[in-house]
Amino acid sequence: MPVVSLAQMMESGVHFGHQTRRWNPKMSPYIYTSRNGVHIIDLVQTAHLMDEAYNYMRSQAEQGKKFLFVGTKRQAAGIIAQEAARCGSHYINQRWLGGMLTNWATIKTRVDRLKDLERREESGALDLLPKKEASMLRRELAKLQKYLGGIKTMRKVPDVVVIVDQRREYNAVQECQKLSIPIVSMLDTNCDPDVVDIPIPANDDAIRSIKLIVGKLADAIYEGRHGQLDVEEEYEDYEGSEEDYDYDETEYADSVIPEDGEEAE
């Protein structure tokens, strides 16, 4: 029995790609047809590759491997955080900071700073400081929690990275390639399947599509670690349109690592 059925994918809009003029020709093997100027993804291939991805991630989880979920677009952010937490994995859902993996030693110092500030806040130590200093440290804490909260317990670079929107998260892809970290990625019709290890052709703009695919990948990790899936639980509803969003790619260029008291651009 397939991990995800054609009916489930159809209902979630997994088959809708981008406009034909925005396609990447390398995705042609995964495209079934076009309709009204929009490419339609071949869901038979998606189902097959989902089985491959599920089995791979379950196997890796059984071996104790660590996973990082990456998805910073607004449709994916809430899903990424919830599903990563559900299966005991790490996540980045706000902004990919340059060197997040390739310069992990430096990023780790910021993570340590985050944990130190959290301890001081919980113990009440910040309340003993002058108001101005305490306010500055709390702003720093909020910023670090926003960007690094999802990797707070990550001790080393991950063994496998799961990506939503490979084109948008290309900085993450490049760092994974440099470190030979396997990538499992949702690929819309404007993406490049050659730069990931296990491609999953799917609509990466619709909330229901992202929720279905990412949820199944989280299931694989959970099953690998616990031997069976937990009882089906209610998921949060993620607000937002399921339309095809356009975005300014220059906004998501390499980001500098935030320093103390400095807001990332």
Curated annotation (Swiss-Prot):
Residues 231-265 are annotated as: Disordered. CDD domains: RPS2. SUPFAM superfamilies: Ribosomal protein S2. Keywords: Ribonucleoprotein, Ribosomal protein. The keyword Ribosomal protein applies. GO terms for molecular function: structural constituent of ribosome. It holds the Pfam family Ribosomal_S2. Belongs to the universal ribosomal protein uS2 family. This is Small ribosomal subunit protein uS2. It comes from Nostoc sp. (strain PCC 7120 / SAG 25.82 / UTEX 2576). The gene is rpsB.
